Every structure is written in structure tokens, then in C-alpha cells.
């Protein structure tokens, strides 16, 4: 497999998940990205490993296929359906656990503080009430921060990490049991601590962890939990279950099983088929109805009523029976919705821009410092948020008249929604029959505040709504990214709902549009702002429709989200894509830009290969594995034929051979071409060295300077054949000699063969080599042994390993002339990790990895392409 070396790849100074990486600790940030032209700065990047989504069809796998019949196939499929159902049920139970304790802690906190405020408002001891609120919030946030110290990947919503995992990037620790425990417990405390975060977004990450861990029936964190379960021992199977778990998390959070399925398709999975669609939808349904069953029973005491489908419920949107002029929305309102979509996109782009700058500041000034600094930052955010909420509720609120009518439906669910709206009204410092509008929004759980904006018949002051929006916008932006488990869906919905309600108030009070329904504008405002932040369209439309249970909102929500996305995309990316980029994850988008088709596979591949032979000595394998970090190696043989004799005496044959040679791309030729292009596009290292020698070297020596530098940088390939002797004077053709490609073998497979003693003596036939079954090869999944932990004294370096039974003899390959768009589509849709480039005569000339298809790498190659035209 190919690595990327800074001296050879002038367009790219960093190494990626599948290429050669520099030695560093996982916590260390290294400057790996290029200078960003729009910001003129270098972003820190990390090395990431890719996942093996491509199936390795080797001899052990074929042996399993030989024993497979229709009966076993049906049993395997039945087990998969049962596992999918279990994932949905467990995800629903996780949501139930989170919701129960968040409600418990929040009610306890607000109950104590509200009682204190009511008593101290007359005694003049409001400072004591503020201290009580600070005590609750700081304690909860401190506990949430401690849990993130235990498992740092539990911070945030986890959606960017899950998106990367489904895209094929292995994010360390993302789907571990310890991560799930820290995530679930941490989100309890962060939400109860009054931070402007939510519990619904982290449900996606929690569901993904359940989906990844449950089918394995074992845990790294709890090593005693070990079951001999023979199924689903590959990244390919785990990816499908993670997709189902992520969809189940969305379904449990919003009561939207179809929206969850579309979310998994739109935002995550790069590979999809009809069978997976049914399983993901079934998993989402299982999660929704599990949560619905238990929540309805616990809150209403009516088991089996299924009245609370998700953690977040918007209630029923319905005009008052006494208002005959009211309509949920009209055709004329669509114009206002489009304008709101534009404003929502602008606000979302502003939010993302500010949060990106904050994230960069944290990466440079907070994360490199001791971990205690992260805890202190979280406590500072909690302190400021608590003071702002308390002071704004006490000082900036206005007393508004309570509505004389209530929207009470015929069903118990709508009655519950109405009771929640009425019971969450806060009357701080207001006379009878009035309420404090600012305190009603700030001194309630976010879900209750959203219901107030959606369904409260009473009015909110435009000044209050504007102040609430500004304060909430800034604090939510500051909060997202601190070291606590958090989410952004509900804060964005609440912020957008305030914006929409403000628009409705302005239209009613100053333009005289009395027919409009304020709840509709609050919903559209919520959709506009959320769409401007996350840039989701299809899945978010369905999620909001399912949450409102009102299909007539389909058109305005879809139009608003599309306009918000188009507006926001003009300025920057969505919030999750921004954080993926800041982490340096080599995420592959859905497709490449049209301009990239000017490049071909030969332009982006890595010709400097590290390879193995079909029969290789143990000493050579150990040397290769210990001196490189590549995750796959081409299995090759050398071409030693001499075609010069055939070219004598027959002009026809001579011309045919010359044509064949001219049409076949070789690694030496490609390397020489790149060496020439580097003279016109030198790296700083080459430029400095050239400057040092420019005065003393003769013209002939100048031309060979780059060649000499490149040859000195690379040591000859390890000697694997006894009749070859290493030479420091190898030419480019000798170093990049033709190699016939036979297949790919993974690092994990080679290490497994060495650990299990799969080899044979030189005096024996390769048939005497022990054979491993498919189950034995996958026994150590997902954490295979490391070559550096291998006891070399137990190995005979002269023994030979026959890798041919265990290599993949038929991986996907491309021609050197394949356009980049074709390479990209094949790589992404098939979930590949390595893509060999093979010429017309079966010789491998390079290899393409995820790194070679990232936007930064392709842009750099395109610039180099323009330089050489």
C-alpha cells in the first residue's frame, strides 16, 4: 500500500489513514493540511485509519461459501433481523433512561429555585436564589466534564464522528461501550446543568454504539463479557448495524422512524441497498414503539396507549375554534417562508462561522493545555449561562396577559401538551392573570419553551423575542464544542422558533395580517434556522413532518429548508461538516467537482509501493510490518523477460512492441514525469537544497540533482530473492521495476498468520503450511494483534509464508487512464479502502487510497496539473 512522502508529493505534505504515517501519539496534533487560501492559515489534522468495508474473497471465505446452503442463508438472515430488532429496542430503552433522569433532575432544580425566587422576591434575597441555581448547574456540568475526561470522544453530539464512521473512517473509541456509558450519563448532567444543549442529538451516537456493540456479544471495556458468536465479524456487517442504530437514535429522539431512515441514508452511509433499507426502517420502528410504549405508560399510566412517540413532541397545530379567519398557512404565506428561509440560511452561516472560529481557538489554546482547563472552560460557560438566564428572567421580561382560551383537544396527548404549556408559564414579579414572558422561555426545559412558542395563545413581546434570540444564539454558539456531551438540534429549533414567532408578531402587529397562525411561523422559523445550521433537507423535512403529525406542513417546510441550505452553502458548510474538516478526517463527499475530471488515476495514485511476494520469508514480513504503517500490501511477482530479441528482424513485431511499451504506463515513467514536474513546482525543501547547490553544480549535474536527491531518500526495497543483492546504485527502472499484480493482503491478515505460526520450511512444500479457517482469521476482530507486540524469539526468520490462500485475489482495480470521477464513485459507493491501479498487461503501477481522493489532495494535484500544462 502506498504512502505519501513530503519530498515526492509536493502538492501534499501530509499522510493519511491508509498511507505512510509519521510516528506520533494519538493526542498529538500535527500540521498536516495545506494552507487554506481563504483564511491563509494551516489547520491541524490527524491521521485516521480506514475501515474494511470491501469483502475479502480469499480461500477461507470461499470455504465458508462452500458450506453455505439455503437453510443456513435463511438462518443467517433471520439472526440479522433479530439483532436489528434488539438494537431498536435497546436504543429506545436508552432514550427512556435519558429522558426519565433529565426530567427528574430538571424538575428538582427548577422546583427548588422557583420556590426560592417566589420567597425571595418579597424578602429581597434573590442573590441566594441565584447561588442555588449556580450550585445545581455547576455541579451537573462538572460531572458531565469529568465523564468526558474519562472518554474524550463522548464530547459533543457524536454526529460528525458517526458520519465519518459510516463514510469509512475509523475514529478511535467512537463505538465502545465506555463511550456509550459516558455519553448517556454525561448528557444527563449537561442538559440538567442548564447548558444550551440537548439530549436528542446524542441519541444518534448512542444508537450507533448500540448497533456496533450488540451484534458482537463482547466488550473491550468489560472483558469478561465474551460469547462465541460466529456472525457479523467484519467492518462490513458492523457498518450496516451502525446505520440501523443511528436511524434508531433519530427515531427515538423525534418519533420519526421514516425520518431516521432517511437521515442514515442522507448523512451517513456511503453504501445502500434495498435489504438494508428494510432493516433500518424496522430498527427505527422498534426504537420508536419501545420508547412510546414505556413513556406513555409511565406518564399517563395507560400502558399500550402509544401517545408519546419521541423524546421531543411538537404537539398538534390547530387554530382556535373561535377564530374563523385563522389558517395554518396559505399560499400567500409561502413568500414569507422563502424570505425566512433566506434569513435562516444567513443566520445559520453566521452561527457556523462563529462556532468554527471558537473551535479553532479551542484547538490552539485549550486542548493542548492540561485537561483541567477543559473542565474550567465548561464551568465558565455554565456560570455565564446561568447568570444570563437568571438576570434576563428577572430584569428583561415583560408581564403579558394570559390567554383566556386553551387549545384542548379530544385526546389525552393534546390535553397533556396543553397542560405542559400552561404549567410551564412563569409569573415571576408579575400580578395575577399575567406572566413573565422572558422567564417563561428561559426558566423552563427547552422542550417546554418550544411548546410555548408553538402553542401559547398569549403573546410574547417583540423586544423579549429579539433579546431572547440574540442571547440564546450567542450562548448556544459558545456552548457547542465544549467538553461535555451535547447536541444542537433542539437549541437550533428553539432559537429558530423565537425568530419565527418574532416574524409572526411583526406581521400581525405592524402589517395587519391577522389571519396568520403564530405557531406555523414559529415552526417555519425553527426549520429555517436548523436547516441553515446543519444543511439537511430530505431527512429533516420528514423528521419535522413526523414530529408535527401534520402532512400539510410538508411543502412549506421543504421549501424553507431548501432555501436555507442554498443560502447557507453560499458562505460555508454545515456545522457537522465544519467540525469534520477541523478534525482533519478524510471524509469523501458524494461526488467530486466537475473540474476534477481533468485528472486521471495516474495523476493521483501513489507509485512508490511497499509490496510482498506470494512466498516470502518471515524476516522480510517482519521487517516490512515493523518499518511501515501501511494497512494493505500488493502481492506481486516480477517480470524478468527480455523483449529485445523479438524486435530484431521483424519490423511489424518491432512496431507492435514499441506501441505496447509506449501505451503502457510504468511506475518508473510516472515517477520520472513527476520528478520533472516537481522542478516547476518545488517544495520548500527541494527549493532550499537546489538554492544551496545552484552556484557550485555544473549544468549536467543540475539536471540530475533531483534524481539524486530522490534516490538518496529511499533505501532499496528489502531483498526477498536470494539471487538479488541490494545496491545503492539502482536506477529508476530497477527501483520501480515492473510488477505483476496478483492481489491484496491486509496487515491484520499478515500479523495473524505470523502469530498463529502459518509458515513452512524451505525444504518442504508449501502444501505443508498450516491452514487457518475464516473463523480463526476473524477471531481477534476488531482489535487484531500488533506486530510490535510479537515475540520474535518464537519465530524462525528463515521460514516461508505462503500468503496466496489469504490474500484477496480479485480486488477492485482501475486503469491508469480512468477519470477521477469514475475512481471516486467506485471507491465511495463500494466502500473501498485501497484501489490498485493496474495497466494493460496486469502490472500494478500505483495504488489509490482515501487520502488520494480528499478534496485537499485533488485540489493540490489539479494545481500541479495546471503548472505542467
UniProtKB/Swiss-Prot annotation:
Binding annotation for ATP: 630-632, 849-852
Motif (Selectivity filter part_1) on chain: 156-160
CDD domains xref list: CBS_pair_voltage-gated_CLC_euk_bac, ClC_6_like
Cytoplasmic face residues: 1-80, 572-869
Effect of residue 410 to A: Abolishes N-glycosylation
Listed result of changing residue 432 to A: Abolishes N-glycosylation
Domain of life: Eukaryota
Keyword Membrane applies: yes
Effect noted on mutating residue 200 to A: Abolishes proton transport, but not chloride transport. Strongly increases anion current
Main location class: membrane
Keyword annotations: Antiport, ATP-binding, CBS domain, Chloride, Disease variant, Endosome, Glycoprotein, Ion transport, Membrane, Neurodegeneration, Neuronal ceroid lipofuscinosis, Nucleotide-binding, Phosphoprotein, Repeat, Transmembrane, Transmembrane helix, Transport
InterPro entries per UniProt: CBS_dom, CBS_dom_sf, Cl-channel/antiporter, Cl-channel_core, Cl_channel-6, ClC
Documented effect of changing residue 267 to A: Loss of proton and chloride transport
Residue positions, PTM Phosphoserine: 773
Binding site for chloride: 157, 489, 576
Biological process terms in GO annotation: cell volume homeostasis; chloride transport; monoatomic ion transmembrane transport; response to mechanical stimulus; signal transduction
PANTHER family (alphabetical): CHLORIDE CHANNEL PROTEIN CLC FAMILY MEMBER, H(+)_CL(-) EXCHANGE TRANSPORTER 6
Pathology linked to this chain's protein: Ceroid lipofuscinosis, neuronal, 15: An autosomal dominant, progressive, neurodegenerative disorder characterized by severe global developmental delay, impaired intellectual development, poor or absent speech, hypotonia, impaired motor development, respiratory insufficiency, and feeding difficulties. Most patients have visual defects, including cortical visual blindness, nystagmus, and esotropia. Brain imaging shows abnormalities affecting the brainstem, cerebellum, and corticospinal tracts. Disease onset is in infancy or early childhood.
Protein name per UniProt: H(+)/Cl(-) exchange transporter 6
Amino acid at each position: 500500500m502506498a504512502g505519501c512522502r513530503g519530498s515526492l508529493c509536493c502538492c501534499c505534505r501530509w499522510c493519511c489513514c491508509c498511507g505512510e504515517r509519521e510516528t506520533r501519539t494519538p493526542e498529538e496534533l500535527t500540521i498536516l493540511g495545506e494552507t487554506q487560501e481563504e483564511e491563509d492559515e494551516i489547520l491541524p489534522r490527524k491521521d485516521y485509519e480506514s475501515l474494511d468495508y470491501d469483502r475479502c474473497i480469499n480461500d477461507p471465505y470461499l470455504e465458508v461459501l462452500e458450506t453455505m446452503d439455503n437453510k443456513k442463508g435463511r438462518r443467517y438472515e433471520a439472526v440479522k433481523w433479530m439483532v436489528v430488532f434488539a438494537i431498536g429496542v435497546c436504543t429506545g430503552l436508552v432514550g427512556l433512561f435519558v429522558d426519565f433522569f433529565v426530567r427528574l433532575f430538571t424538575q428538582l432544580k427548577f422546583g427548588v429555585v422557583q420556590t426560592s425566587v417566589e420567597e425571595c422576591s418579597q424578602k429581597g434575597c434573590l442573590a441566594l436564589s441565584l447561588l442555588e441555581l449556580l450550585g445545581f448547574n455547576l455541579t451537573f456540568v462538572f460531572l458531565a466534564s469529568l465523564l468526558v475526561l474519562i472518554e474524550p470522544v463522548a464530547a459533543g453530539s457524536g454526529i460528525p464522528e458517526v458520519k465519518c464512521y459510516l463514510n469509512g473512517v475509523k475514529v478511535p473509541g467512537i463505538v465502545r461501550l465506555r463511550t456509550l456509558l459516558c455519553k448517556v450519563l454525561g448528557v444527563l448532567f449537561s442538559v440538567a446543568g442548564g447548558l444550551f444543549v440537548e439530549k436528542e442529538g446524542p441519541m444518534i451516537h448512542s444508537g450507533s454504539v448500540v448497533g456496533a456493540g450488540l451484534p458482537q456479544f463482547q466488550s473491550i471495556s468489560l472483558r469478561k463479557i465474551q460469547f462465541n458468536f460466529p456472525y457479523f465479524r467484519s467492518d462490513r456487517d458492523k457498518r450496516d448495524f451502525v446505520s440501523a442504530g443511528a436511524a434508531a437514535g433519530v427515531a427515538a429522539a423525534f418519533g420519526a422512524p421514516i425520518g431516521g431512515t432517511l437521515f442514515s441514508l442522507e448523512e451517513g452511509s456511503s453504501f445502500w441497498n434495498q435489504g438494508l433499507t428494510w432493516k433500518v426502517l424496522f430498527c427505527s420502528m422498534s426504537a420508536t414503539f419501545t420508547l412510546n410504549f414505556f413513556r406513555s405508560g409511565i406518564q399517563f399510566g395507560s400502558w399500550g396507549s402509544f401517545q408519546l412517540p419521541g423524546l421531543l413532541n411538537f404537539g398538534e397545530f390547530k387554530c382556535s375554534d373561535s377564530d374563523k379567519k385563522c389558517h395554518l398557512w396559505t399560499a400567500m404565506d409561502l413568500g414569507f417562508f422563502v424570505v425566512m428561509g433566506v434569513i435562516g440560511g444567513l443566520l445559520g452561516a453566521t452561527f457556523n462561522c462563529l462556532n468554527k472560529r471558537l473551535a479553532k481557538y479551542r484547538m490552539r489554546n485549550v486542548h493542548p493545555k492540561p485537561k483541567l482547563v477543559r473542565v474550567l472552560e465548561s464551568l465558565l460557560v455554565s456560570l455565564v449561562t446561568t447568570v444570563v438566564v437568571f438576570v434576563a428572567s428577572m430584569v428583561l421580561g415583560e408581564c403579558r396577559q394570559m390567554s383566556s382560551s386553551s387549545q384542548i383537544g379530544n385526546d389525552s396527548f393534546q390535553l397533556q401538551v396543553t397542560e405542559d404549556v400552561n404549567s410551564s408559564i412563569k409569573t415571576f414579579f408579575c400580578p395575577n392573570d399575567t406572566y413573565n414572558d422572558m422567564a417563561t422561555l428561559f426558566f423552563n426545559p427547552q422542550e417546554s419553551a418550544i411548546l410555548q412558542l408553538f402553542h401559547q395563545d398569549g403573546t410574547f413581546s417583540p423586544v423579549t423575542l429579539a433579546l431572547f434570540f440574540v442571547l440564546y444564539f450567542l450562548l448556544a454558539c459558545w456552548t457547542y464544542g465544549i467538553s461535555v456531551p451535547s447536541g444542537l438540534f433542539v437549541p437550533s429549533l428553539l432559537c429558530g422558533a423565537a425568530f419565527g414567532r418574532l416574524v409572526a408578531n411583526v406581521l400581525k402587529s405592524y402589517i395587519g395580517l391577522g389571519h396568520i397562525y403564530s405557531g406555523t411561523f414559529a415552526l417555519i422559523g425553527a426549520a429555517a434556522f436548523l436547516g441553515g445550521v446543519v444543511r439537511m433537507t430530505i431527512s429533516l423535512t420528514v423528521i419535522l413532518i413526523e414530529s408535527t403529525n401534520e402532512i400539510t406542513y410538508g411543502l412549506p417546510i421543504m421549501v424553507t429548508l431548501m432555501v436555507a441550505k442554498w443560502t447557507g452553502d453560499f458562505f460555508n458548510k454545515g456545522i457537522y461538516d465544519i467540525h469534520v474538516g477541523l478534525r482533519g478526517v478524510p471524509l469523501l463527499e458524494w461526488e467530486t467537482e466537475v473540474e476534477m475530471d481533468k485528472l486521471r488515476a495516474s495523476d493521483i495514485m501513489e507509485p512508490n509501493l511497499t509490496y510482498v511476494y506470494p512466498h516470502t520469508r518471515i524476516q522480510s514480513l517482519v521487517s516490512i510490518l515493523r518499518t511501515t504503517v501501511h494497512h494493505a500490501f500488493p502481492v506481486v511477482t516480477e517480470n524478468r523477460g527480455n523483449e529485445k530479441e523479438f524486435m530484431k528482424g521483424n519490423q511489424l513485431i518491432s512496431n507492435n512492441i514499441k506501441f505496447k511499451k509506449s501505451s503502457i504506463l510504468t511506475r518508473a515513467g510516472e515517477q520520472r514525469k513527476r520528478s520533472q514536474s516537481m522542478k516547476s513546482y518545488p517544495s520548500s525543501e527541494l527549493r532550499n537544497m537546489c538554492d544551496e547547490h545552484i552556484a557550485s553544480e555544473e549544468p549536467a549535474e543540475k539536471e540530475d540533482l533531483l534524481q539524486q536527491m530522490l534516490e538518496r531518500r529511499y533505501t532499496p526495497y528489502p531483498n526477498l530473492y536470494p539471487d538479488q543483492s541490494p545496491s545503492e546504485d539502482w536506477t529508476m527502472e530497477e527501483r520501480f521495476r515492473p510488477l505483476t499484480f496478483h492481489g491484496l493482503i491486509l496487515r491484520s491478515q499478515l500479523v495473524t498468520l505470523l502469530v498463529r505460526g502459518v509458515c513452512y520450511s524451505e525444504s518442504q512444500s508449501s502444501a505443508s503450511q498450516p491452514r487457518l479457517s475464516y473463523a480463526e482469521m476473524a477471531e481477534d476482530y476488531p482489535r487484531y494483534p500488533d506486530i510490535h507486540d510479537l515475540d520474535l524469539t518464537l519465530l524462525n526468520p528463515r521460514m516461508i509464508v505462503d500468503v496466496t490462500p489469504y490474500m484477496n485475489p480479485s480486488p477492485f482495480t482501475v486503469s491508469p487512464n480512468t477519470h477521477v470521477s469514475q475512481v471516486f464513485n467506485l471507491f465511495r459507493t463500494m466502500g473501498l479502502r485501497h484501489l490498485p491501479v493496474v495497466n494493460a498487461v496486469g502490472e500494478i503501477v500505483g495504488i489509490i487510497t482515501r487520502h488520494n481522493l480528499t478534496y485537499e489532495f485533488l485540489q493540490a494535484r489539479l494545481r500541479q496539473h495546471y503548472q505542467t500544462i
